Amino acid sequence: LAITIAPSFFLLSALFVILQYSYSLIFKHISVIDILAITTAYFLRVYAGEAAIGYHISIWLSLAAVSLALFLAIGKRRAELTLLGPTKKASPANTRDSLSHYSEKLLDTYTAMFANSTFLTYAFYTFLEKPINRGFLFTGYGELATAVSDRKWMMITIPFVLFGIMRYMQLIYEGKGESPEKLLTSDGSLLLTIIAWIGSVFFVIYGIGG
């Protein structure tokens, strides 16, 4: 089925399956490599989507995707350590080999680093990306349409990304970030933020054209 969509989509899907098996058998037991493997899995999904729909992802959006993937992967590990806090009976060494090599301070540093990286690369994307100019609201208004569509309207989506990062970090330290996929859709605040972000992106691209 995957190869009928696009050869590149099939290749990325195959790599994703191989990575998942490799992670389960090997990578999840090796510190740092486990985080990079989770990150690569997220990134393969992004590029599989690109291959499926034929949309070219710009360099800044790619960097934002990589940073977000690292942020989610590290958040997953940090949440696991939070659950294994001093009041818990289990210890990192008894749950997964790689966790025994992570300290809270190290993962806190990683989390802050890639939270900042995610925000900055996305902000640069909104500032530097060329307007798409598909808007319909000002069609037929000549110079006004050009002036409006030339604005960097994608910047209005930045607050949603900022809030999403801050809210996700809060949930990580509450020990709720073990499964990023479930958390992104089960937490009401995050879900509303994602919906608002998607809505604002569609409005900017297909409404204003910026």
Q: What are these language model-derived features?
A:
Residues 1-53:
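Intramembrane alpha-helical segments
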Residues 25, 43-210:
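C-terminal membrane-associated helical module and adjoining short loops/tails
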